[in-house]
UniProtKB/Swiss-Prot annotation:
Disulfide bonds: none
Coiled coil: none
Protein name, entry field: Ferredoxin--NADP reductase 2
Protein keywords: FAD, Flavoprotein, NADP, Oxidoreductase
Source organism per UniProt: Shouchella clausii (strain KSM-K16) (Alkalihalobacillus clausii)
Keyword Oxidoreductase: yes
Subunit-structure text: Homodimer.
Length: 330
């Protein structure tokens, strides 16, 4: 294990949207910044799970691809040259007698005056399809992530699920796939109302309320899927080239739970300054919680500057929490 002896003003744990915007804002406040990300790339779930998916609820963008948003956030942060550490997961956080912090990862030891946790939902894994042979076909043509939408051009695709991801992927596949069928075990979808309206007007075939009963295939992958009616005797077998499963994700904060932080429902409670119960440790984005919290990318973009400005005052009590508007800082 190596020791990174440089002392940073702010170390951001998590390189997703909130973390990247926080890195930019901290740079704008002339803080020495480090970002530690456990994944091989920046962007969090946007890059890892749906880089080709369009996002519609970010201010200023009628729509923007997830990876394009990550690229823009990265370029914005890089203006101030924060130190980026990839493929390191922070295991321990320890406060020292001099009020600074020591962060130990699986590879290095890092030193910082303040910490901002923007770890999203923490470590995540997809909920798997619980049908015989599903694990065998997973490396072939059963997909839990979509990294290249064009790979489904001209294909017969079945999407299984009823939430936002399932509906959004079905709509995005409709123009390029040969045919798209969306299967959900309930009559009603849990997706955004506007997306459901678009779905009903699309050519996507909707099969509800049905659930997966059997997979048919060979050594090359699934060739057909049999679905059974949830409260009936009807079955239907659909020929497929690819199956996309969107049952959501199971997430955990992992080692973060052992850092002495208050934890509430797999999130970190904060006050209006984004302060946790440990002075000098802040949280923003989906990992943070408070009364009325709404988990949106846009919400994290507001929380990040609040956390950074208060961290600035924490390490330098003579600093102002509100630095003025960016138009006067550049």
């Amino acid at each position: 294990m190596q020791e990174q002896k440089d002392m940073f003003d702010l170390t951001i744990i998590g390189g997703g949207p909130a973390g990247l915007f926080a890195a930019f804002y901290a740079g704008m406040r002339k803080m020495k910044v480090k970002v530690i990300e456990s994944m091989p790339q920046l962007g969090g779930q946007l890059s890892a799970l749906y880089p080709d998916k369009y996002i519609y609820d970010v201010a200023g963008f009628p729509k923007v691809k997830a990876q394009d948003l990550v690229d823009q956030l990265t370029a914005q942060a890089q203006q101030f040259q924060p130190e980026i550490v990839l493929e390191e997961a922070v295991q321990t956080l320890e406060k020292q007698e001099d009020e600074t912090f020591v962060l130990t990862t699986d590879a290095n030891i890092h030193y910082t005056k303040a910490v901002l946790i923007t770890a999203g939902a923490g470590a995540f894994a997809p909920r798997k399809l619980q049908v015989e042979k599903a694990d065998f076909y997973e490396d072939k043509n059963i997909h839990y992530f979509i990294r290249d939408l064009s790979a489904f051009t001209g294909k017969r695709v079945v999407v299984i699920g009823g939430g936002d991801s399932a509906v959004d992927w079905a709509l995005m596949l409709e123009p390029i796939a040969k045919e798209v069928t969306l299967v959900h075990r309930r009559d009603a979808f849990r997706a955004h109302e506007h997306s459901v309206d678009l779905l009903k007007k699309s050519s996507v075939r909707i099969l509800t309320p049905y659930e997966t009963a059997e997979l048919h295939g060979d050594e090359n992958g699934v060739t057909a899927v049999t679905f059974s009616e949830v409260k009936g005797d009807q079955t239907e077998t659909i020929a497929v080239d690819d199956v996309i499963v969107n049952f959501g994700f199971v997430s955990t904060l992992g080692p973060i739970k052992e850092w002495g932080l208050e934890i509430r429902k797999n999130a970190i409670p904060v006050n209006t300054k984004m302060e946790t119960n440990i002075p000098g440790v802040y949280a923003a984005g989906d990992v943070s919680t408070y009364d009325g919290k709404i988990k949106l990318i846009a919400t994290g973009f507001g929380e990040a500057p609040t956390a950074v400005n208060n961290a600035k005052v924490y390490i330098d009590p003579t600093a102002r929490a509100f630095p003025g508007h960016s138009t006067s800082l550049f």
